[in-house]
C-alpha cells in the first residue's frame, strides 16, 4: 500500500484543512489525476491520530459513493494520502451550477440518493462519518457524489462508547449533540443529511448558527422548542435549559417552497428532533420520493400528508446500533 512520492507530480493547491493540505496531482506513470492530502508530521509527536483513523477507515470503505484511497506514502516528516481526484465539492458545485446556489430538483434528488447510499454503506460497516457538510461531499464531472474527509469519523463497534461531542461543523450538528450527548448513533449523520438536503433546495444553510446556544435557538425557531412531553429525557442533557423561549414548529413548505410534498415528507423524516425518531439511511433510500430512481416504471405514489410523521415512525422505528446513554 505504501508508494513513493516521486510517482506523483504535485500541481496546484486545492485547499487547506485543520491538519492537512490538499493538492491536485498527477500519476507520472499513468497520467491520471489524483488528490494528494499532505500531513506534516511532528518528529516528537509522530503521526496525528486523526490521520491514522482516516487511513484505517478509508482502506475499509470501498463504495462508489465514497472517495477511494489509492495509496499511502509515509516519509520521515510527511504523510501523503493519495485519493481519487474529484472536480469540486458540493458547496462549490452549488455556487457554479445553482440558481443563487439552489440546485434543480432533479439534481438534488440524484445527489441525495447518492449521499444516502454512501451513508448507508458507512453505517452498515459500523462507521459514523460525523462531519457531513457540503465541503466534504465531492462531485466529479460525471455527476457522481462521494463522501470525503473521514478525519473525524470513528468506527463504533463497541457499544456504550462515550464520544467527544466536538464534532460536525456547527450548522450541520444534530440537536442531541448540541445538547451535550456524548453517546450518539448513526442518527447524527442523518440530521446532517437533512440540513444538506434543504440547503441544496434553497441555496442557503438551514441553520447558520454562530455558537452552540445560537445553533440550538435557530433549530428551535424552525422545528419548535422541545420539552419532556415532545422529547422524553431531554432534561437529562448537560446543555438543557428549562427557560428557553418557546417556539412553535414552522411549516417546512414555507422554508423550502420549491420542494414537493413527498420531498418534504422525506426532509421531515430526516430532521426529527429526537435522534431515535429519525429515519435510517436504508429507510430513506426506500422512500417514495426516490421511486423514479429505484422503480422508474412504477406507478407514482402519493403520501396523504407530509406532516403525519407519528404513524410513519411507528411503522419504521429508528433502531440505533449503539444504545443511547444519557
Swiss-Prot record:
| Molecular functions per Gene Ontology | ATP binding; cyclin-dependent protein serine/threonine kinase activity; protein serine kinase activity
Concerning SMART domains, the annotation shows:
S_TKc
Q: Name one GO biological process term.
A: lipid homeostasis
List compositional bias (Low complexity) regions by residue number: 305-326
Which reaction(s) does the protein catalyse, per the Swiss-Prot or TrEMBL entry?
L-seryl-[protein] + ATP = O-phospho-L-seryl-[protein] + ADP + H(+); L-threonyl-[protein] + ATP = O-phospho-L-threonyl-[protein] + ADP + H(+)
Record keyword Glycoprotein present: no
PROSITE patterns (alphabetical): PROTEIN_KINASE_ATP, PROTEIN_KINASE_DOM, PROTEIN_KINASE_ST
A GO cellular component term found in this entry reads: cytoplasm
Q: Is the Nucleotide-binding keyword given for this protein?
A: yes
Q: Which UniProt keywords apply?
A: ATP-binding, Kinase, Nucleotide-binding, Serine/threonine-protein kinase, Transferase
Provide the binding site for ATP.
14-22, 37
Q: Which domain of life is it from?
A: Eukaryota
Annotated region Disordered: the residues are 300-326
Q: How does it assemble?
A: Interacts with a number of cyclins.
Recorded family membership: Belongs to the protein kinase superfamily. CMGC Ser/Thr protein kinase family. CDC2/CDKX subfamily.
> What does it do?
When phosphate concentrations are high it phosphorylates the PHO4 transcription factor thus establishing repression.
Q: What is this protein called?
A: Negative regulator of the PHO system
Amino acid at each position: 500500500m505504501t508508494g513513493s512520492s516521486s510517482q506523483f507530480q504535485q500541481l496546484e493547491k486545492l485547499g487547506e484543512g485543520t491538519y492537512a493540505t490538499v493538492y491536485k496531482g498527477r500519476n507520472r506513470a499513468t497520467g491520471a489525476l489524483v488528490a494528494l492530502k499532505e500531513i506534516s508530521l511532528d518528529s516528537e509527536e509522530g503521526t496525528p491520530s486523526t490521520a491514522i483513523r482516516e487511513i484505517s477507515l478509508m482502506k475499509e470503505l470501498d463504495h462508489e459513493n465514497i472517495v477511494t484511497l489509492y495509496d499511502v506514502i509515509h516519509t520521515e516528516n510527511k504523510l501523503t494520502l493519495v485519493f481519487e481526484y474529484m472536480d469540486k465539492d458540493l458547496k462549490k458545485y452549488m455556487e457554479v451550477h445553482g440558481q443563487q446556489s439552489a440546485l434543480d430538483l432533479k439534481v438534488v434528488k440524484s445527489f441525495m440518493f447518492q449521499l444516502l447510499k454512501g451513508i448507508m454503506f458507512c453505517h452498515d460497516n459500523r462507521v459514523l462519518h460525523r462531519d457531513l457538510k457540503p465541503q466534504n461531499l465531492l462531485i466529479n464531472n460525471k455527476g457522481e457524489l462521494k463522501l470525503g474527509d473521514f478525519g473525524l469519523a470513528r468506527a463504533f463497534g463497541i457499544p456504550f462508547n462515550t464520544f467527544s461531542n466536538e464534532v460536525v461543523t456547527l450548522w450541520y450538528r444534530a440537536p442531541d449533540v448540541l445538547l451535550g450527548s456524548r453517546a450518539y448513533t448513526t442518527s447524527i449523520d442523518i440530521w446532517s443529511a437533512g440540513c444538506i438536503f434543504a440547503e441544496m433546495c434553497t441555496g442557503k444553510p438551514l441553520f447558520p448558527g454562530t455558537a452552540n446556544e445560537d445553533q440550538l435557538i435557530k433549530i428551535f425557531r424552525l422545528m419548535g422548542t422541545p420539552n419532556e412531553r415532545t422529547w422524553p429525557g431531554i432534561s437529562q442533557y448537560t446543555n438543557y435549559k428549562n427557560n428557553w423561549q418557546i417556539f412553535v414548529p414552522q411549516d417546512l413548505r414555507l422554508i423550502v417552497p420549491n420542494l414537493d410534498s413527498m420531498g418534504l415528507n422525506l426532509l421531515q423524516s430526516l430532521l426529527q428532533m429526537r435522534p431515535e425518531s429519525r429515519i435510517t439511511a436504508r429507510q430513506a433510500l426506500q422512500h417514495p420520493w426516490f421511486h423514479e430512481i429505484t422503480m422508474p416504471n412504477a406507478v407514482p405514489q402519493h403520501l396523504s400528508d407530509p406532516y403525519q410523521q407519528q404513524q410513519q415512525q411507528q411503522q419504521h422505528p429508528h433502531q440505533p446500533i449503539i444504545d443511547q446513554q444519557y
